[in-house]
Each structure stands twice: as structure tokens, then as C-alpha cells.
Amino acid sequence: MSQTSHDRLLIIDFGSQVTQLIARRLRELNVYCEIHPYQNVTMDFVREMAPRAVIFSGGPDSVTREGSPRAPQEIFDYGVPILGICYGQQTMMTQLGGRVESGHGTAEFGRAYVTPKGTLDILDGWFTDGREQVWMSHGDHVAEIAPGFEVYGTSPGAPFAITADTSRHFYAVQFHPEVHHTPNGAKLYENFVRLAGFKGDWTMGAYREEMIRTIREQVGDKKVICGLSGGVDSSVAAILIHEAIGDQLTCVFVDHGLLRKNEATEVVGMFRDNYNIQLIHADESDLFLGELDGQSDPETKRKIIGKLFIDVFQKHADTIEGAEFLAQGTLYPDVIESVSFSGGPSVTIKSHHNVGGLPEKMGLKLVEPLRELFKDEVRALGRELGLPQSFIGRHPFPGPGLAIRCPGEITREKLEILREADAIYIDQIRKHGLYDEIWQAFVAILPVRTVGVMGDGRTYDYACALRAVTSVDGMTADYYPFTHEFLGETATRIINEVKGINRCTYDITSKPPGTIEWE
């Protein structure tokens, strides 16, 4: 639980896949909130957190099932506004004396329209056209509202789509206001936090000052090591920590030989020259590429890179005397996902490359100044710290680097070809003003050679795939709809300017079923 001095809002998570979107909508309103799984929320926890308001999330379970998730019964006597969403509405009704039934032709999945029934303060700004589009996802439905509640909105499948007990400031909706498919959902959240009395003072300027104080109190006069990747998260974390403790921070930048064109030079230059941060540049490309020689299985490549990264980082970190802390760019979604809702195992899609085992292995304590932030908030904090937009807005880049954009065996020749092709592709995207519209774009060099003709000669070179996707959070993604003219112009440049490629393709696979990266 955060020690922030700001007003808090507690989101009790009943397992919805979009619970994080609730938190994001609230953060956009400058309201500090935390997500906690229902099984961890006791009244002692609630009293310690002292939230100004509570939201019950949706969830996949049925409140009609014996033993299904519930909120602490006493929370309804705690005296703060409560908003129940989908399953959250249903458990609120059940726990307060209403009744929920399963199915029977009233299930709703997808777009629906709610019509008003009376006026309600939380619906200020709604129903300007007589009805409101919302996103439904429910099999069960409220059959009888709890005592004290009244109906304020209905839909064909949910006669109690919006209900409220205004005397206790309890509100309950059957739909999901947090998703984009409920176009006016943000207004509902805005009304709720206003009625709850939030000041809207959760800003990155305030967070910066608060976190600097926290880092100084935590670290004292001890030294901190930070693994710098050159990405936005680790860079913002490093600059914030450096602002707090100055030369007590040393960054270790491990160059595994799998970076993009000129990336190592740019990262080292920015942090040494612009920010005067003590930096160890560990060029270990020969070691990494040597260990990867002959390896083609993607999981094997990831594991080799992950293990070597930890070994190399530790070797260089051991040269820093008196270091007691390790800084990491952990974000709030990482924190949420580490506390599993169900506690059950999940299928490993891909191994994640990080330094998760380092603190215990090195006997270091963690400094995680971004652990309360979402990605968009990290970028806002970066702007607050003076990082240029060209850096803050960079597309995500995987820890294993170009290794997972080079299916099959990795060679220095293929990496050089890939760097050049990727640089041209990104240059094309920037020239056409498309970079900020795209979540991630890159080139993958394919493990196949094709026959081509250049001039009067025959070529037998590699094919490459261009990849560009749009996404909100990387969990799902759609391919970017480039024009044929753009793709033709880009393919021509790559084939003409990069020796070793004679064919370009464009990957139009969405996620799911594909992943964003090729490996």
C-alpha cells in the first residue's frame, strides 16, 4: 500500500479483465487509486488505507454461485461512496438484500443503449440525446434491487442498468463505463469522484516532489545501482533518482550487441553529457553473440540473454563499493500482475527478460520509484523531468533486443542488415508524420533467402517483414493500415539501400492470434 499523502480511492478487484482501465480513467482525473484483489481486502486493510471512496470491479464469476467473491460486509457501513460495476453491482445488490438471477434471456454482451429513468447526480452530462451507448458483458442480471435503491436507467437486457441509494451515496451500474465502447464513461467517473470530494491533486509535479523525498528517506547516504536499458521506464527512474541523491547513483548500461542503430552511443551520450549521471558502459556484445551462436529456438535465446544479463550486470555492479540498493523501473501493472487474482498458474507465452532475480542474488534492497504509475504517467513524469518528447514517445523495445526480431540463428551479418533496414523504416514513418500514431514498429529479418533481380544480375538475399501496430496497452493490437504508396516507397528504399535484402513483406496479423514481436 502506498504511503502517499493524497486522497485515495480503493478499487476492489473481482477479476475483470478491464479492471486496470478503471484505474487509468481515475488517474486521468488526477485521482490516486489502488487496485487490490477482493480476497486481500479486509476491514482492517480498509481502515488502514482510509479511502475516500470505493469501486467494485466487474468479474467473471456468478454471484448466484455459492462461495462466489464478496466485498467485506462492513464496508457498506464505512461511510464512503461506493460504485459497483457489472459483477460489482450484482454483489452489492446481493449483499444489501437484493436478488440476482442467472441468464433466462437477459444476457447482454457488447454494445447496448441505456435510457434514463429520473435524474441522478452521478449522471450529470449523460442522456443529452435521450439515451446513452454503453458496453455490456453480463449473463446474470439484477432481478430485485436492494432496499433503499431506486432505478435511474434501463436497457433491454438490464431493467436495473443504473441504480442508486442516494442517501448513502451507493451507485451501481450493469455496464462497463471504463471501456472505450462506453463513449461517455469518463464523465460518470468524473461525477463520482467529484461527489466523493476528491481534490484532483494527483499530478506528476506533486508525485515528483513526493518521490524525491521518499527516495532520500529510503536511501539515506547509501549508494544505488540502476540497470539502464535506454528505454523510457529505466531512464525516467534513473533521472528521478539522480535528482534525489545525485552521485550516490551509478547506472550500468549493458550493451549486448542487440541494440538498434547508434542506440548505445545515443544512450551513453544523453546520460553522461546531458544529465551528468555516473554510468558504466558494459560492452559485452562479443560475450552475448558468442553464447547465442548456433541457437535458433526463441525460448533458448531469451533464457541465454536473461542469464547473461544478470551475470554481466552483477559483475559490473560488484565494482561499485558500498551499494545497498538496486533501482528498477517497475510499473504499476507489474505490481498488479504479481498479485494474481486467482493465484492459479497461467501459460507462459514468452519468458520475460528482466532483472527480477538480482535483488536477492546480490543482497540488495529495491528502489522502485515508478511502481505506482502506469506507462502514460511515466511519460508524463518524463516530461516533468525535462526529457525530450522524441525520447519519451519512443516505441517499446524488448529487453532481448534484435534477437527476437531475427528468427532462427543470429549472426553479426544479419544483425547489421536488420539495423539498417529498421533505421530506414522508422525514418520513413517519421517523415510521413505517422510515428506517434503507432504503438510499435520494427523490421524482422526472416530466416529465408529469396531470388531477386537487380540490374542484370541475380540476387539471393534475405526477405524481411515490416511490422507496425496500434494498441492502448500492448495486451491487444491491430496492424497499422499503411497506404500502398507508403509500403511501396519504404520497400523500395530498403531493397535499394540495404545490401542483403531483396524482398519486403508487411505483417498484417493482429494480437491475438499473433504476438507483436516475432519471437
UniProtKB/Swiss-Prot annotation:
Binding positions for ATP per the UniProt entry: S229, G230, G231, V232, D233, S234, S235
UniProt cross-references to Gene3D superfamilies, sorted A to Z: 3.30.300.10, 3.40.50.880, HUPs (3.40.50.620)
Pathway given in the UniProt record: Purine metabolism; GMP biosynthesis; GMP from XMP (L-Gln route): step 1/1
Coiled coil stretches, renumbered: none
Domain GMPS ATP-PPase span(s) in chain numbering: 202-394
Signal peptide positions on this chain: none
Keyword Nucleotidyltransferase part of the UniProt annotation: no
Listed GO CC annotations: cytosol
Domain Glutamine amidotransferase type-1: 8-201
Subunit structure and binding partners: Homodimer.
Name of protein: GMP synthase [glutamine-hydrolyzing]
Organism: Ruegeria pomeroyi (strain ATCC 700808 / DSM 15171 / DSS-3) (Silicibacter pomeroyi)
Upper taxonomic lineage: Bacteria, Pseudomonadati, Pseudomonadota, Alphaproteobacteria, Rhodobacterales
Recorded name of the encoding gene: guaA
